[in-house]
Design a protein with these regions (language model features):
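Active-site-adjacent betaalpha module
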Residues: 2-6, 11-13, 18, 27-43, ...
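Substrate/cofactor-recognition hotspot
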Residues: 23
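Catalytic-core segment of enzymes that process non-peptidic bonds
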Residues: 48
Length: 191
């Protein structure tokens, strides 16, 4: 079975000490590195919150969150050991930026102009085999934060063979993460 790993928002601003820290983020991201080195994954999709400096989700603009993941800042960068593991293992990697102007929790509601909407390619009759999910493909979703962007990405793909890797994910609210998984019938596994 082919396995695609979707790594959601593994960015410095979501790690402990970041601008919007998720407890357990460093451990989850280090587990992702180990999984990338395991040889079990053939394709990786990385997503990044990629906000402008006056993003609608920021408290200063009337939003819910502190400023975080501003484009072209260190806080918006993906955790370097993950990028190193992708390169070391020569994994096919697609990168998605989300939320430049609008609030986008799911990687697959990406409306950020200038960036390809990967999901449209993945679910069509694309002739490029790397841009198409197959019936026998397992999609493993992980990253930060489990109860927000990871869960919304899983919900967008819930009709596919998709699971969330619990040991590769950290949540702001673990109870909410579990309730949402039950509500939307999303399978949570250890990998």
């Amino acid at each position: 079975m082919n396995k695609t790993l979707i790594i959601v928002d593994a960015q410095y601003d979501f790690m402990e000490g970041g601008k919007l820290p998720v407890e357990g983020a460093t451990a989850a991201l280090n587990n992702i590195v180990e999984f990338l080195n395991s040889g079990e994954v053939s394709t990786v999709i990385t997503t990044q919150d990629w906000h402008n400096g006056k993003h609608c989700s920021f408290k200063e603009q009337g939003g819910e969150f502190p400023e975080h993941c501003v484009a072209e800042t260190h806080g918006a960068d993906i955790y370097k050991p993950i990028l190193d593991a992708i390169e070391k293992n020569n994994l096919l990697n697609f990168s998605l930026y989300k939320g430049k102007y609008l609030e986008e929790f799911s990687a697959f509601t990406n409306r950020t102009e200038g960036y390809a909407h990967w999901f449209e390619y993945a679910t069509t009759d694309s002739t490029d085999p790397y841009l198409q999910f197959h019936e026998d493909e397992q999609v493993i979703i992980c990253g930060l934060a489990g109860d927000i962007c990871v869960m919304n990405t899983a919900i967008a793909l819930k009709d596919m063979n998709v699971v969330i890797a619990d040991n590769l994910t950290a949540s702001l609210n673990e109870d909410n993460f579990r309730k949402l998984a039950d509500q939307y019938n999303i399978t949570i596994v250890e990998v």
